[in-house]
Amino acid sequence: MATATYTSLETYLGTSYEPDVDYVDGELEERNVGEYDHTIVQRAILIWFYLHEKEWSIRSLQEQRTRVGTTKVRLPDVSVFSRDVPIEQVFTHPQLIAIEVLSPEDRHYRVDEKIRNYIEFGIRHIWVVNPRTRAGWDCSDGNWVRQERFEVSGSPLYLSLPELFAKIDEEQVP
């Protein structure tokens, strides 16, 4: 059985990893990225919010390091920040929305752990999208609630999975 090697937070923050990794209590956790289905959906979500940045007064970023606790740094696949949140190299303020795009290798317990970290950090909207089944879940309260359209109450922000996947399908036609 392999033993994990402890890495200090300072070492992690001062090191570039390719691909980047989550930092959890001194251990580096690989993230499942790089497959086409994951990448194309992540890109489409990022573009969805990028096209509305001025209108909705937001910033959308992919795989942005976010310090979700004193010993935890996570990289949501897509983060949506209010423009009021100061820009930092490693964010220490909660984003408005954290979105995880599932890969076939993702395990439910690991995604649940990320969701718990996001909730404890104060992220109010946590959404999970499965590119293969085209299903989505609002996990903002820790439960997996199936959604086709995600909304941020009291604001114009939304993400429609049917619209998103229709745009992806249009791109796939030669």
For each predicted feature, which ranges?
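Gly/Pro/Ser/Thr-rich low-complexity, intrinsically disordered segments predominantly at protein N-termini
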Residues: M1-P174
